């Protein structure tokens, strides 16, 4: 009997595949695209840099001049008490957010908006960046990290620089437990070894010259713990006919 695909099992919404979103620090997005940004710029100070269990990149807590606090993706080389700017007249410095039409060609950018004002949708993983290739009247061409050329609305915002946390994948997990916790934080299931791939001493379905259970996979509900694998107390198996 076949197995359900992971995407099918995730769709049921069981606790195994449910993301622990109650641990997340909050929504990481740009502030609203208001008159302050459309006609000038707004300055903010980085008051903290925190870790969000739900993402790979560090998150900066920014307090703006108008008293507003926002969580934004931290760029490389940023530090607490640094200033960042948001708006059409902001300078071209790492961490500053501007409309694509105001950013020079060849500049590395990240957290690009798909539509103006949506808060940022593309290039948000640690260590990633996209390159602004060329400007046109009604679109801006950007080379994504995958190498794909994608057209964006010139009024969509992006942040200058590279997302912090680069080189994350170069550090090995070393232990299966570390891998387990990294997957669990994002609502993913740790991989397990199949019983038919084991030796006979390790699993009731193990052993043999090829990978097959070698015996019926139905088992009594009253079987001992080490034997209770497969279809437990199944009334029937196989397809309905």
UniProtKB/Swiss-Prot annotation:
UniProt keyword annotation of RNA-binding present: yes
Chain segments annotated as coiled-coil in the UniProt record: none
Molecular function (Gene Ontology), one example: structural constituent of ribosome
UniProt keyword terms in alphabetical order: Ribonucleoprotein, Ribosomal protein, RNA-binding, rRNA-binding
Pfam families associated with the record: Ribosomal_L2, Ribosomal_L2_C
Gene3D superfamilies linked to this entry: 2.30.30.30, Nucleic acid-binding proteins (2.40.50.140), Ribosomal protein L2, domain 3 (4.10.950.10)
Disulfide bonds: none
Record carries keyword Ribonucleoprotein: yes
GO cellular component: cytosolic large ribosomal subunit
Region (Disordered): 200-241
GO biological process, one term: cytoplasmic translation
InterPro entries for this protein: NA-bd_OB-fold, Rib_uL2_dom2, Ribosomal_uL2, Ribosomal_uL2_arc_euk, Ribosomal_uL2_C, Ribosomal_uL2_dom3, Ribosomal_uL2_RNA-bd_dom, Translation_prot_SH3-like_sf
Protein function: One of the primary rRNA binding proteins. Required for association of the 30S and 50S subunits to form the 70S ribosome, for tRNA binding and peptide bond formation. It has been suggested to have peptidyltransferase activity; this is somewhat controversial. Makes several contacts with the 16S rRNA in the 70S ribosome.
Family, per entry: Belongs to the universal ribosomal protein uL2 family.
Assembly: Part of the 50S ribosomal subunit. Forms a bridge to the 30S subunit in the 70S ribosome.
Family matches, as PANTHER family: LARGE RIBOSOMAL SUBUNIT PROTEIN UL2 (PTHR13691:SF16), RIBOSOMAL PROTEIN L2 (PTHR13691)
HAMAP family named among the record's database cross-references: Ribosomal_uL2_A
The name this protein goes by in its record: Large ribosomal subunit protein uL2
Organism: Methanosphaera stadtmanae (strain ATCC 43021 / DSM 3091 / JCM 11832 / MCB-3)
Taxonomic placement: Archaea, Methanobacteriati, Methanobacteriota, Methanomada group, Methanobacteria
Gene it is expressed from: rpl2
């Amino acid at each position: 009997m076949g197995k359900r695909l992971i995407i099918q099992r995730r769709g049921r919404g069981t606790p195994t595949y449910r993301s622990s979103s109650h641990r997340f620090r909050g929504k990481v997005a740009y502030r609203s695209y208001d008159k302050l940004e459309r006609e000038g710029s707004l300055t903010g100070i980085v008051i903290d840099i925190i870790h969000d269990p739900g993402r790979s990149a560090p998150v900066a807590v920014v307090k703006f001049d108008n008293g507003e606090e926002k969580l934004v993706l931290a760029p490389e080389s940023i530090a607490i008490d640094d200033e960042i700017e948001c708006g059409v007249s902001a300078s071209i410095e790492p961490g500053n957010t501007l409309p694509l039409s105001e950013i020079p060609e060849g500049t590395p950018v990240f957290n690009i908006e798909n539509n103006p004002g949506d808060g940022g949708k593309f290039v948000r993983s640690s260590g990633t960046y996209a390159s602004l290739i060329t400007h046109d009247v009604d679109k801006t061409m950007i080379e994504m990290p995958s190498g794909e050329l994608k057209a964006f609305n010139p009024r969509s915002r992006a942040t200058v620089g590279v997302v912090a946390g680069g080189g994350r994948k170069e550090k090995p997990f070393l232990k299966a437990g570390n891998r387990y916790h990294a997957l669990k934080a994002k609502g993913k299931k740790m991989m397990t070894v199949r019983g038919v791939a084991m030796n006979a001493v390790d699993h009731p379905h193990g052993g043999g010259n090829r990978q097959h259970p070698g015996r019926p996979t139905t088992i009594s509900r009253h079987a001992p713990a080490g034997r209770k694998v497969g279809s437990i107390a199944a009334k029937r198996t196989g397809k309905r006919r």
